[in-house]
């Protein structure tokens, strides 16, 4: 497809398609062209695409003609602007309405307008119609703002990337077969809709996304539904090309988006129909099954370690066909209700044709699920609060009043004689609390400091209401006047409260909480309740007891939100027959945990459980106290309680009263109100861990008590007896997965399972839980999907263009967007898009964002990142220095390890290229021979790109001037907060004096608790908004790095480059080549597939794996466990005395006996590769996390040369730690080369092992000196 408009990109297109070498000159010329391209040029380039008929479909004209907004809103009895609900109680999203009548034109861009100032002013004065218009205008604008950058940039990058035609895959030795843009339906729709809206106007973009806000085209055909629609179309257009999605499925996705735009509310329609693709593909697959293979995994004991073993494959046959009940009726009803019957019918027809579980069938599921809308859903804060915080659970079997004792302060104890199932809840929490309080570490001052510090962050925490509540009792707080920090942070709060007694701060426990919002993809927006410091403080016993339950009593894998942090093999195991899994989710979990049932029982249980171990002791700065005890009728006594119990008393008062939620809706002028709610606060440190503990405890009660009492079906009884929460029920928060292990006889009968599930639903109703149960032959856990042991990445949940913008703050200044763009690239890697197409598109996208106009002094200048910066950040080259194309894999690490890897792969080529291009010198270098690499790397901007990539991409705000007195007062207050226990301070002081004797001079700036107050101060500064000067300073620093000429890479990279390897034979595959493990990673996607089968999948929890590579698992917020770890390892490596290690551990707060024991262990213990490599800041790249990198380090990388030992490759006896670094270097090369991961042998260390080791030791000694 030759486009006249794109000719200026010609050389760049050839270089990212592997036809010519990539070079920085070509890259920067293209970046200039990208920045000169106007929005209208993008539409002209679209006009040139000769779309074929199969890309077209009827666009309903109703998407352009929408009613006025005023019939969709009203003012309620409390004088709040509210949305009228026409379609159902949850129809409170942005209505699809016309907008032109609310706009006033922009001064210079006259075709565009934004919400008229006159209307906003009338709204401020309380005019009802104007308030309604402003609410609609602002929330529609918010919906349009949920993108990373203007859509045209993403579209232009797609046009440029795809102009290179189909790509040659050197591994498969053929061209890929992805249809070109003329078959791209979403792109055609995008063009047609924009054409139709702009009509005769000279400007073609329907709306402008600018830093000042959103400007709408002044066209009568423009509606509020157009921005989310276009955002979805662009996402789909890019995915169709880069993931090789089936165009006919994408067309169905486009139809749903068009229906949503034609409906009365885009977001609402999307939310109601989001299940169409999964329901008719994933959840109804294989009703007949004729073959295929699934993995046979064994879950190793103890199960809580989450380690699995691959035992080969299991052939699938008809007996493993889907046995779960059919969803046909439900699916067709949904289709009829929303006018999508044809889409449902088409999907079901196609799903039935897949009777074999193989690469094609799972790719079909992935392609279909990728077609769901990926916008961030938006609604006003008022509606969110009134939707989410007004539900109260219906408890069918409440706890009888007579089963409680009289009050002990704020709590009552549940009597043993009660018949309520609450007694099991009480028992579990009581036991856990008693054991938690009996652990000596609970009372350790460091542990308490860690607990007190974990919520001291740069996030907000309802500070204004806290201050008001304290002023009300005449407590004045220090205001640290003139300090350049953001006051709305919990760091500032902690400093203000540091020296107040608990008797004062406890008043703030009942203070209002302010409001936070999160917008999500394919889920309702949530409101967040940021608790203040005293509220978080008294939640600690609740958190700690729940943590004890989750750690010792159930099977809860703690995991982060990124795909790579979740336990992928668990889903593989659960979904591989003969195992079966049931996805159990608790609907409205926060709202279902209230004082009426759960919290009253839990508070009493903890209060009584900790009693014997905590007598008289304060805890986390909360003193012991006395309460009235009327638990025995007619007797009133004073009962002394400990600090921990005192916390529970205050927390109970809060839970019993509920939370007072202060809503200040910035989208609706005049919507200011306080809402009382009993819903559990989403911002508490206890929320997630608490829900997990209740989830598992209630399930245990069901399996062991309630279930067996309520059925006499022998099969159901047998099933319940075989399940335990230590082995079969995995839960996190409100999400649960019941895993029914296959028996020797095969799968458990589906009818038995359904009977069991009906019982679970009935059981939940007794205490107000609505279990949302899905039993359909697939496993879904924490938003990961599996079928027959294969993960189905959900591409629609990682939108390429979308970005959550929950508040109206301005977007972050360039170059912070580059981190988001690299994030988009890595999401694509984790999701297994087509590797060559995705790398090519990512190069085009990065190029489009690599240049920025800036003011330098009085003149306009341009800041430009060289292409090498992106390589440093992890984007692999396509072809360079005369290499073959596509020899670099997307598994190339980031940073120095990645630079080492790609340079080592083509080092002889680079030397030859440099000499051929006239870069010759008489001085021979060890790495590049007679090539004048210094001059070359400066001229190609390779050095500049390398160094610019390491500079901050956010302006630095911690350099602001402040009077010394106030600054010291602030850090002293933070220090008092942290070192509230004098014993902690004396440990650190003792560590410091020991350090002076044994450690000084070995390494610089060892981590210490004394650094924390200053780090918190910096954190509170960095949370502030950057000034113009700070932005200019960042630009200036980048500019200087670009102009500077360099003579080398970093000392570490220069040392790495002395190591040479020999790549040898391919290994035996780790898994069967016929086995689909991740949809899209299949023989059509060569490099990721070959890496997966040669390295093998990761078969254990990555989080557990990395937790085992740390000496200290937890530390105070503000210190980094990795930094402590590398300091300890460096000391050991540099031959420090054991006493120096003890001193280091004392400085981070350990008690002497513990520090001494740990230091001894560190000196002697064998340390794993991943941990040892931290001494030079090497870490496992994120892109390797789904692969078995551990066995790669152990088995693929050989430190003994192929032809026997050499003097140069011998590792001196005292330098065993060098092996870890070498293993990383070798693995980096193996993973950076495309194709099968081969065995690699060490060949040469220039200058020998000892000299390399000494280089690293010198570096370790100097590191931190500059810090």
UniProtKB/Swiss-Prot annotation:
The entry's keywords: Capsid protein, Hydrolase, Nucleotide-binding, Nucleotidyltransferase, RNA-directed RNA polymerase, Transferase, Viral RNA replication, Virion
Organism annotation: Reovirus type 3 (strain Dearing) (T3D)
Keyword Repressor attributed: no
Protein name in the entry: RNA-directed RNA polymerase lambda-3
Lineage per the UniProt record: Viruses, Riboviria, Orthornavirae, Duplornaviricota, Resentoviricetes
Main location group: virion
Pfam families the UniProt entry points to: RdRP_5
One GO cellular component, as annotated: viral nucleocapsid
Keyword Membrane belongs to the record: no
Chain's gene name: L1
First-tier enzyme category under EC: transferase
GO BP field: viral genome replication
């Amino acid at each position: 497809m030759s486009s006249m408009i794109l000719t200026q990109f010609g050389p760049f297109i050839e270089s990212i398609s592997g036809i010519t070498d990539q070079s920085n000159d070509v890259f920067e010329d293209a970046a200039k062209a990208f920045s000169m391209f106007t929005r209208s040029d993008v539409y002209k380039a679209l006009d040139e695409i000769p779309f074929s008929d199969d890309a077209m479909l009827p666009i309903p004209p109703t998407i352009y003609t929408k009613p006025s907004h005023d019939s969709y809103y009203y003012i309620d009895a409390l004088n709040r602007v509210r949305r009228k609900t026409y379609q159902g109680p949850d129809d409170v999203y942005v209505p699809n309405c016309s907008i032109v009548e609310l706009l006033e034109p922009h001064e210079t861009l006259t075709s565009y307008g934004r919400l008229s100032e006159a209307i906003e002013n009338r709204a401020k004065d309380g005019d009802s119609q104007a308030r309604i218009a402003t609410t609609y205008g602002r929330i529609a604008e918010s919906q349009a703002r949920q993108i990373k950058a203007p859509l045209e940039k993403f579209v232009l990058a797609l046009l440029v990337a795809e102009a290179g035609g189909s790509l040659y895959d050197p591994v498969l030795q053929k061209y890929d077969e992805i249809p070109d843009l003329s078959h791209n339906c979403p792109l055609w729709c995008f063009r047609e809709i924009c054409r139709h809206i702009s009509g005769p106007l000279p400007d073609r973009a329907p709306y402008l996304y600018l830093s000042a806000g959103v400007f709408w085209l002044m066209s009568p055909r423009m509606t509020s539904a157009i921005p989310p629609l276009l955002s979805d179309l662009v996402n789909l257009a890019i995915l169709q090309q880069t993931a090789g999605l089936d165009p006919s499925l994408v067309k169905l996705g486009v139809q749903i988006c068009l229906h949503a735009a034609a409906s009365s509310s885009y977001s609402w329609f999307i939310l109601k129909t989001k299940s169409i693709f999964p329901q008719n593909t994933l959840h109804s697959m294989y009703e007949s099954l004729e073959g295929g293979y699934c993995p046979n995994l064994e879950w190793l004991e103890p199960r809580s370690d989450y380690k699995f073993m691959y035992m080969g494959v299991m052939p699938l046959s008809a007996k493993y066909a889907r046995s779960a009940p059919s969803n046909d009726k439900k699916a067709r009803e949904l289709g009829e209700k929303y006018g999508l019957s044809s889409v449902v019918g088409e999907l079901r027809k196609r799903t039935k044709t897949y009777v074999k579980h193989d690469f094609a069938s799972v790719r079909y599921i992935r392609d279909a699920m990728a077609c769901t809308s990926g916008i961030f859903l938006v609604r006003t804060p008022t509606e969110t609060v009134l939707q989410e915080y007004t539900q109260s659970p219906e408890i069918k079997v409440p706890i009888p009043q007579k089963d409680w004792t009289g009050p002990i302060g704020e709590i009552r104890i549940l009597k043993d004689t009660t018949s309520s199932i609450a007694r099991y809840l009480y028992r579990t929490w009581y036991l856990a609390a008693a054991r938690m309080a009996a652990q000596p570490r609970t009372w350790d001052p460091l542990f308490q400091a860690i607990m007190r510090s974990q919520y001291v962050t740069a996030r907000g925490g309802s500070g204004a209401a806290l201050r008001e509540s304290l002023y009300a009792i005449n407590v004045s707080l220090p205001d640290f006047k003139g300090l350049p920090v953001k006051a709305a942070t919990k760091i500032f709060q902690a400093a203000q409260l540091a020296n107040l007694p608990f008797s004062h701060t406890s008043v703030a426990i009942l203070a209002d909480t302010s409001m936070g919002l999160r917008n999500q993809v394919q889920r309702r927006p949530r409101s967040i309740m940021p608790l203040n410091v005293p509220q978080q403080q008294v939640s600690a016993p609740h958190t700690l007891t729940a943590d004890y339950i989750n750690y010792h009593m159930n099977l809860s894998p703690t995991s982060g939100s990124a795909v790579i942090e979740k336990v992928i093999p668990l889903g593989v195991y659960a979904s591989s027959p003969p195992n079966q899994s049931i996805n159990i989710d608790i609907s409205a979990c926060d709202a279902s945990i209230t004082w009426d049932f759960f919290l009253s029982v839990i508070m009493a249980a903890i209060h009584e459980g900790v009693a014997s171990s905590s007598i008289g002791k304060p805890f986390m700065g909360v003193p012991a106290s006395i309460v009235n005890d009327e638990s025995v009728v007619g007797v009133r006594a004073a009962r002394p309680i400990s600090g921990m119990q005192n916390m529970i008393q205050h927390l109970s008062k809060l839970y019993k009263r509920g939370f007072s939620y202060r809503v200040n809706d910035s989208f609706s002028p005049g919507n200011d109100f306080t809402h009382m709610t009993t819903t559990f606060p989403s911002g508490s440190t206890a929320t997630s861990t608490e829900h997990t503990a209740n989830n598992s405890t209630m399930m245990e009660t069901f399996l062991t008590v309630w279930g067996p009492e309520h059925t006499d079906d022998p099969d159901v009884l047998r099933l319940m007896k075989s399940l335990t929460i230590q082995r079969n029920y995995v839960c996190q928060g409100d999400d649960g997965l019941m895993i029914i292990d296959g028996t020797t006889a095969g799968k458990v009968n589906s009818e038995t399972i359904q009977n069991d599930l009906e019982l679970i639903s009935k059981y939940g109703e007794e205490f107000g839980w609505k279990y949302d149960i899905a039993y359909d032959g697939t496993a879904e856990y924490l938003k990961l999907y599996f079928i027959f042991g294969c993960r189905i990445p959900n591409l629609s949940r990682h939108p390429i263009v979308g970005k959550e913008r929950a508040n109206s703050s301005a977007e972050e200044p360039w170059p912070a967007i580059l981190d988001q763009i690299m994030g988009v690239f890595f999401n694509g890697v984790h999701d297994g898009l087509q590797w060559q197409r995705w790398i090519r598109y990512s190069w085009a996208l990065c190029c489009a964002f690599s240049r920025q106009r800036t003011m330098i002094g009085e003149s306009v200048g341009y800041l430009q990142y060289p292409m090498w910066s992106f390589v440093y950040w992890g984007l692999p080259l396509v072809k360079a220095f005369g290499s073959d194309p596509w020899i670099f894999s997307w598994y190339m690490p980031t940073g120095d390890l990645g630079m080492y890897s790609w340079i080592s792969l083509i080092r002889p080529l680079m030397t030859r290229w440099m000499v051929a291009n006239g870069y010759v010198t008489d001085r021979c270098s060890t790495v590049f021979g007679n090539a004048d690499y210094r001059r070359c790397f400066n001229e190609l901007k390779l050095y500049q790109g390398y160094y610019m990539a390491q500079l901050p991409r956010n302006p630095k705000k911690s350099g602001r001037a402040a009077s010394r007195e106030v600054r010291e007062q602030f850090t002293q207050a933070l220090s008092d907060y942290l070192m509230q226990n004098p014993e902690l301070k004396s440990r650190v002081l003792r560590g410091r004096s020991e350090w002076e004797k044994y450690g000084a001079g070995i390494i610089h700036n060892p981590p210490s608790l004394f650094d924390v107050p200053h780090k918190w101060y910096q954190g509170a500064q960095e949370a502030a908004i950057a000034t113009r000067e700070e932005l200019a300073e960042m630009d200036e620093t980048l500019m200087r790095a670009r102009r500077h000429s360099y003579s080398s890479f970093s000392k570490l990279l220069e040392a790495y480059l002395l190591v040479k390897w020999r790549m040898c034979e391919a290994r035996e595959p780790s898994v069967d080549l016929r086995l689909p493990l991740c949809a899209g990673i299949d023989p059509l996607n060569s490099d990721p597939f070959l890496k997966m089968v040669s390295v093998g999948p990761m078969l254990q929890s990555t989080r557990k794996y990395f937790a085992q590579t740390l000496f200290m698992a937890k530390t105070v917020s503000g210190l980094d466990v990795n930094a402590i770890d590398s300091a300890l390892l460096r000391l050991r490596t540099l031959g420090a005395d054991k006493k120096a290690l003890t001193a280091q551990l004392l400085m981070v707060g350990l008690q002497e006996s513990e520090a001494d024991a740990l230091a001894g262990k560190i000196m002697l213990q064998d340390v794993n590769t991943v941990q040892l490599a931290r001494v030079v800041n090497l870490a496992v790249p994120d892109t390797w996390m789904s692969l078995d990198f551990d066995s790669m380090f152990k088995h693929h990388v050989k430190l003994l040369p192929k032809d026997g030992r050499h003097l140069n490759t011998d590792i001196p006896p005292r330098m065993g730690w060098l092996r870890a670094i070498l293993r990383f270097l070798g693995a980096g090369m193996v993973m950076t080369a495309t194709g099968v991961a081969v065995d690699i042998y060490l060949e040469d260390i220039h200058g020998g092992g000892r000299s390399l080791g000494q280089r690293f030791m010198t570096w370790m000694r100097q590191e931190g000196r500059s810090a």
